[in-house]
Amino acid sequence: AMRRVRTLLEFGCEITVVSPEVCEELREKVLWKKKRYDETDLESLGNVGEASRFIFVLAAAAPEVNEKIVCDCRKKKIPVNNASNRDQCDFYFPGIAKDGDTVVGITSGGGDHRLAAKISAAVRQILRTIAV
């Protein structure tokens, strides 16, 4: 989940973390709700129209917590990404190759993260070569 949060922050997203703990690196960069998830975290988003600008990325240690959040998000039509279960992902995070204003995203549709990472590294190298 840390890689996903770093990527979202790099593109200017505002991140809220709901967790009893958060790593030091993120404390200054995110809004941290120091608590365990409960349904009221979604209720505070308002109606589905307002919630449509939100996504949820899950990385709880307990699979049952992730499954509960997936279920709650889907009831409100909020896109969700369960980092521990690709079958519970409404979207996937691409590998990113970035050079200046050029950004390329590579995904394997959740199937082969290593392949996507290798291709991302190759594209980064190509971008560096072109930029020279």
Identify the role of each PLM range.
Residues 1-132:
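Adenine nucleotide-associated cytosolic modules
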